[in-house]
From Swiss-Prot:
Binding of ATP, residues: 23-24, 65, 68-70, 131-133, 174, 184, 221
UniProt KW keywords: ATP-binding, Cytoplasm, DNA damage, DNA recombination, DNA repair, DNA-binding, Hydrolase, Nucleotide-binding
InterPro entries, A to Z: AAA+_ATPase (IPR003593), AAA_lid_4 (IPR041445), DNA_helicase_Holl-junc_RuvB (IPR004605), P-loop_NTPase (IPR027417), RuvB-like_N (IPR008824), RuvB_C (IPR008823), WH-like_DNA-bd_sf (IPR036388), WH_DNA-bd_sf (IPR036390)
Sequence segments annotated as region (Head domain (RuvB-H)): 258-336
Ranges for region Small ATPAse domain (RuvB-S): 185-255
Gene Ontology molecular function: ATP binding; ATP hydrolysis activity; four-way junction DNA binding; four-way junction helicase activity
BP term (GO), one: DNA recombination
Oligomer status and interactors: Homohexamer. Forms an RuvA(8)-RuvB(12)-Holliday junction (HJ) complex. HJ DNA is sandwiched between 2 RuvA tetramers; dsDNA enters through RuvA and exits via RuvB. An RuvB hexamer assembles on each DNA strand where it exits the tetramer. Each RuvB hexamer is contacted by two RuvA subunits (via domain III) on 2 adjacent RuvB subunits; this complex drives branch migration. In the full resolvosome a probable DNA-RuvA(4)-RuvB(12)-RuvC(2) complex forms which resolves the HJ.
Cited HAMAP family: DNA_HJ_migration_RuvB
UniProt note: domains: Has 3 domains, the large (RuvB-L) and small ATPase (RuvB-S) domains and the C-terminal head (RuvB-H) domain. The head domain binds DNA, while the ATPase domains jointly bind ATP, ADP or are empty depending on the state of the subunit in the translocation cycle. During a single DNA translocation step the structure of each domain remains the same, but their relative positions change.
Identification of the protein by name: Holliday junction branch migration complex subunit RuvB
Length: 336
């Protein structure tokens, strides 16, 4: 069974978003990483402000924990407008969407996380709202049913998804700005960790920050989570600052290895090696053998393993690479 609170998961834990708020950057000057995307959106914001228009609709996609919500907040702040946040599953019926849109003022940002999970009837109403700033909904039932026209102020929809492929073509086509959120490099993650440590009034040296960064799976949310856990160990050990020694001690105890793999990652790789000679093997077969949902593997486990070159996809299925064998200390017997 998948552990919803894997410490290296990019997903947020229950209540974690509230704790993260103090660490979130509020402006582009504070926002570290994603330089190309940040520079691109910054230009669009400056142009929209010069024309005194709302920013075009923005779609952000990529693995969880990379800062899609934070970037939406920064966009609103840079535009000088308010932001209203919700999720796709929370908008259950057209009336829920109407209520959200009616609260917006001209230029405001509506952020919908997990936008790929919007119900179809809600998504269809969103088309005219995004394109022409109005919605038509049917009020009443039977013979008394009639359409009601709701004009809307110009607004910016920022949609976020971890599964861009699940978005319908009509919805995807209505986003003028599409940004791919990429995994962070260790230099940027180290800067994020040092900034967070400063906000948390926690001392940390460069080597300690780098050691956390290399185990953070390219993900700021994971980096901040590991920082907080290491801080606990440092305080209990009466360390005046976080250094490499305390990071290694804490994260080894938490079973997060030097490249950020945890027990679930290692279980997956070892099952593929021991049961299927490293592959190729189908996703559903892997899922059945390790007791996980195939969607969980595809969304939460596999992307990082592919990013670091430990798994590769082939037409016949997934395969474990030589690099993964070497990392796990398992002899590689395949030829070719």
């Amino acid at each position: 069974m998948y552990d919803e609170e894997r410490i290296v998961s990019g997903d947020s834990f229950e209540g974690e978003d509230l704790n993260e708020q103090s660490l979130r950057p509020q402006t582009f000057d504070q926002y570290i990483g994603q330089k190309l995307l940040k520079d691109e959106i910054s230009v669009y914001i400056q142009a929209a402000k010069q024309r005194e228009e709302s920013l075009d609709h923005v779609l952000l996609y990529g693995p969880p924990g990379l800062g899609k919500t934070t970037l939406a907040i920064v966009i609103a702040n840079e535009m000088g407008v308010k932001i209203k946040t919700t999720t796709g599953p929370a908008i259950e019926k057209p009336g829920d969407l109407v209520a959200l849109l009616n609260e917006l003022e001209p230029g405001d940002v509506l952020f919908i996380d997990e936008i790929h999970r919007l119900p179809k009837n809600v998504e269809e109403i969103l088309y005219s709202a995004m394109e022409d700033y109005f919605i038509d909904i049917i009020v009443g039932q039977g013979p008394t049913a009639h359409p009601v026209h709701f004009p809307l102020p110009p607004f910016t929809l920022v949609g976020a998804t971890t599964r861009a492929g699940l978005l319908s073509a009509p919805l995807r086509a209505r986003f003028g700005i599409v940004g791919h959120m990429e995994y962070y490099n260790e230099v940027d993650l180290s800067q994020i960790i040092k900034r967070s440590a400063q906000i948390l009034s926690t001392g940390i040296d460069d080597e300690g920050a780098h050691e956390i960064a290399r185990r953070s799976r390219g993900t700021p949310r994971v980096a901040n989570r590991l920082l907080k856990r290491v801080r606990d160990f440092a305080e209990v050990k009466h360390k005046d600052k976080i250094d490499t020694e305390i990071v290694q001690f804490a994260l080894d105890l938490l079973r997060v290895d030097k490249v950020g793999l945890d027990r679930t990652d290692r279980k997956l790789l070892k099952a593929m090696i021991e049961l299927y000679d490293g592959g190729p093997v189908g996703l559903n077969t892997i899922a059945a053998n390790i007791g996980e949902e195939s969607d969980t593997i595809a969304d939460m486990i596999e992307p990082y393993l592919m990013q670091i070159g430990f798994i590769k996809r082939t037409p016949r299925g997934r395969m474990v690479t030589l690099a993964a064998y070497e990392h796990l200390g398992i002899k590689y017997n395949k030829e070719g």
